[in-house]
Structures are given as structure tokens and as C-alpha cells.
Amino acid sequence: MDNELDNLISLLQKSKASLKEKHGDRIRSIFAAHHSGSILPKEDKSLYDKCLATVDLLDEVQQMLTPPLHTLIDGFFGFINSKTLLCAVEFGIPDALSQGPKSIEQLASSSPQGELSPHRLTQVLRTLTGIGIFNYDKTSKLYSNNATSDLITTAHWSKWVYWTKFYPTEFYDMMRFLPDHIKANASRTAAQSNYNTDMEFYEYLSNSGLAKEFHRVLGAGATAQLPGMISDFPWDTLGDETVLDLGTGSGEFLFQLLENYPRMRGAFMDIPSTISRIQAECEQPGGRFSGVRDRVAGFHAGNFLDEVPASVVYTIKWCLHNWSDEDTIKILQNIRRAIVVKPEARLLIIESVLEDGRTGRPARYGDIIMMATCNGKERDIENWQAVCEQSGWEVVKSWALRNSIPSCLELRPI
């Protein structure tokens, strides 16, 4: 075993040095090459996937070699990462560093929230630099942003900064009630217990005034992940078919597809109030979606649990994880009955696919969040295949999407 570990240490040291010195700029470009609404470079996809495969393999090795107590300690104190990240954003550290490297004294004295303790701020930033958020140069004793902390500046187009302010607060409080929720006789979700209500989660958001902030956070995440969604499935193979987006929400996803694929046509379906807003954005001069109005084939107000309009191609994004398997099968059956069967016919589900490994963590986090809020869930590929087969569909491929938590499941009618 000594020789194995010596060889592994030597190999990792050499690989780390080579990647940093010879390929550092290339690695940074692979992860930085995404902008709002833009198509990602196709030539980067293979390297991106290899990076993630390497991360998963290294994570397996790390788990083998990590003392069990160290693993438990990460479980005991995982909340510290969330709360120190919240502190950094609340006190404007990423924004301050966007102007250039700074000392701890400069950061402590320039916070928009008032002067901070340099010593205590050092403790917070030591935790964050240790997990790859921010850089610290021991020689100059200066902090700087890195590719990760750049994402949480207020000026960054992705607005991931909204997530750092919402999840470590609202959802942090909610998770205190997770043990009660797991009990077989639980009558309330963790969210209902946290807010002391019997209202469903989304109903409570609307009635409490939290809905606006919640949808701002989710909307930011959706926008941030759009480049991978519109780049890593071959949408151009759909030609001039009409894509009907079910549960369209903000409408931004379909709008970006139409913007980037000029032969494509699209249609929206959601509840009446959402469709009214989207239709106005399409038809009013200067509206957000007015530039693609000539390729919008319809605005459909309704409930996909009842029925859906006929179409050759459907998309549904971040909806089915809210529903039980029984309701999901009902929705998929409605789409199967309505689809116009021809060679191009398909349903594209953009949802998380539960997987093991380091890169599977985001979906596993999402699975707990869906349970805690609305008794929903994410699904592994076997679960997806089961609900799809029971409703008349075959999952022909799961497409991995860059810089995105979900995958794109391609379904064909059977």
C-alpha cells in the first residue's frame, strides 16, 4: 500500500502542476465560456465532461482515504459553509474584490454594512478560501476573486448572488423541521412546520409576500443555466417544428430557444395569469419577447393535469419534480394522447437526474428541498424510465447540460 500511495501522490503532484502551468487558462475558459443567452462552444463539451468525470473519480479516491471522523465533521458542520458564504455576500466582499485584490483591513473598512472586525472577517474568509471560494495570496496577504466568487458579485449576469441570500436563510430555517417531516405519521412538510401553516408551500408564498423573492431567486437560477440548456441538446434537428413549452413560467427558456434557432416556432402553456403576461410581452412594442412574435404559434391557458394542446414537440422544465409518480404519469399520459406522431415527435423533460458521485450533489440537494417544501422529489434514471414507460414513452437519451443542475431527457412516444 505504501508504494501505491507514494505513486498516487507523485502522479497527482505532477498532474496538478501540469494542469496549472500548461492548461490553467484553458480550464478557466471552459468554465467561463458562458454568457446570458449565448450558445456555448461545442468544442468545449468533451473537455467539460472529462473534467467532471475526473472530479467524480477523485472524489471516490478521497472517500476511500479520508478518515471517517473527518467525513463526519463535514456532516456536523456543513451549515458553516452556508452561513459564512452568506456573511461574505451580505458584507459585499465579492463586489469589493471585483475592483481588485484587497487586504483584510481594506475589506473590513469598506463594507456597505459598516466597519467589520478584521480578525473575525479573516476567520470567515479562511473557511471560504478553504473550499475554493475566493483566493488568498500568502505572500502579499491579499484576497482576490476567483471564478467561483465572480459568480456571486451583484453585477454578474447570472445573479447567483440571490441564491446565497435566500437558501442559507429561508431554507436553513426550514431544514430544522426535516426530522419531523420524515416520520411516517407526519401531517406537515418541513416548510409548513417552519411557517406554522397548513397551506401548501406555493400557496403560502403567495399569501405571505414571499412569492416575489422566491420567484426572483428561481428565475435567476433558470437564466444562469440557460446557456447549457440551449447548447447541449441538438435543437437544430427539430427544424421548423413548433415547440410547445408546458408550465412555461417566465417564458425565458422558450424565448431563448427561438432567439438562437431561427427556424424554430414555439407556443406557451401555463395558468391564465402567466399566459396573459407572456402574451403582453410578445405583442406590446418593445416587449421582452416581441422580437420573436412572428414565430409564436399560440398562447394556451390551462392545466396540464387536465389536457394539453396538440403538438409535435413538447418541453417541460422544472415542473414534474413537484408531483408524485401518480400525478407525473397522468401528466405524461395527457401529453402522449395529444402528441402528433411523426418522426420528429418527442417530449423533452428538463429535470434533475439523481446520480452518485461528487457531481451528483446538486440533484441530491434538490431532492431534499423538493421533499421539504411540497413532498416532491427528484428521480434517478430508473425512476424516470418507469414513469415514462407506464405513460407511453421511451427515454431514448439523457443529455448532460453544461453549467446546469438538470439534464435533458429525450422521450419518444411508444
Curated annotation (Swiss-Prot):
S-adenosyl-L-methionine binds at residue 270. One of its GO terms (molecular function) is protein dimerization activity. Its EC number is 2.1.1.-. GO terms for biological process: methylation; secondary metabolite biosynthetic process. InterPro entries: COMT-like (IPR016461), O_MeTrfase_dom (IPR001077), Plant_O-MeTrfase_dimerisation (IPR012967), SAM-dependent_MTases_sf (IPR029063), WH-like_DNA-bd_sf (IPR036388), WH_DNA-bd_sf (IPR036390). The keyword Methyltransferase applies. The keyword rRNA processing does not apply. O-methyltransferase; part of the gene cluster that mediates the biosynthesis of sirodesmin PL, an epipolythiodioxopiperazine (ETP) characterized by a disulfide bridged cyclic dipeptide and that acts as a phytotoxin which is involved in the blackleg didease of canola. SirD catalyzes the O-prenylation of L-tyrosine (L-Tyr) in the presence of dimethylallyl diphosphate (DMAPP) to yield 4-O-dimethylallyl-L-Tyr, and therefore represents probably the first pathway-specific enzyme in the biosynthesis of sirodesmin PL. This is O-methyltransferase sirM. It comes from Leptosphaeria maculans (Blackleg fungus). The gene is sirM.
